[in-house]
Amino acid sequence: MLARPGLLLACAAAIVAAAVRPAAQAEALFEFHSNPWLNLHHILWARGERSAPPADMTNADRSAWNEGIAFYAPYAKRDLLFDEELVKIKVALRTVETNTSLDGVVIDAGVKATLERLMPIYRKHWWPAHDRTNREWIAAARTLVDQYGAALNAAIARAYGVTPENPVWVDVAVYAHPVGAYTTTSPTHVLISSTDPGYSGYAALEMLFHERSHAWGRMLFDGVTAAATAQGIKTPPPLPHAILFFIAGDLTARELKQHGIAYKHYAEGGLYDRLCGTGCGVKLAAHWGPYLDGKRTRAEVFTALVASFK
């Protein structure tokens, strides 16, 4: 749901995803992973969330586990998305999914030692169930992407005027972020929850494309900023994120509607109002809906949407 701004990709021709045969859509668009190191790291950051010590845990293991959570306590006060060290840890752990140690991984020595000390305990008591949960979520998401992914990917690309760099790396974890998911860029790396009920069913499809769209979030920030400056209007700071929600949500709803499926945007449950004020969802539909229909330009829509906050 959240992301660090990335550089805007250059405008290019229509993407080739629509030509991918259906059975390969998920693999072509998203590369899914269930990484024990990233799962453990995020559980410790969340002070043991999703990992209540089992009754048969030895005193030694329980003590070591509690010490690890205590070590991570200062990190738990820092933002997973905007704290540079936490981002570096996430990036470093991304590629060691199958490693039995963190040899050669360049992260804080204390973090490395804590993760290596606790990994055998985590594997013994929690990882088999967590990995199974992650892979069940991945299987369900793959099915949806296989059915609807190519068309939705093409629509997202048209909306942003880009050629997406696919596949996007997606790590699935039992605990991902307080809001369920977050994305870092350069390269685009999504981390998404397998246990958050808000990311299940068709919402998983929307939120995968929402998260990957953060690669172009800077475009929305710059567009809102330029229009607001030109008109001397102050807009809600989360407005660019609300636009990103609307684009992914509306395009997902449009694609599913073509298959006879009624779908409500993730943010239509009150999130639009929380992001940018009462009635914001109506404003987004009034201005960005015509843009997605191909009837207005982005510049026109930014100007009109910002004006609605006067």
Model-derived features with residue positions:
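Mature extracellular/secreted ectodomains of secretory-pathway proteins
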Residues: 57-136
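Active-site recognition of the HExxH zinc-binding catalytic motif
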Residues: 203-222
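Auxiliary, metal-adjacent structural segments of Zn-dependent hydrolase domains
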Residues: 128-185, 240
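Bacterial Sec-dependent signal peptides at the C-terminal "C-region" and cleavage site
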Residues: 15-25
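Short pre-active-site segment immediately N-terminal to the catalytic Zn-binding motif
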Residues: 192-208
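Bacterial N-terminal signal peptides that target proteins for export
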Residues: 1-9
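Post-HExxH zinc-binding segment in Zn-dependent metallohydrolases
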Residues: 25-79, 90, 94, 220, ...
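Pan-zinc metallopeptidase signature
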Residues: 263-310
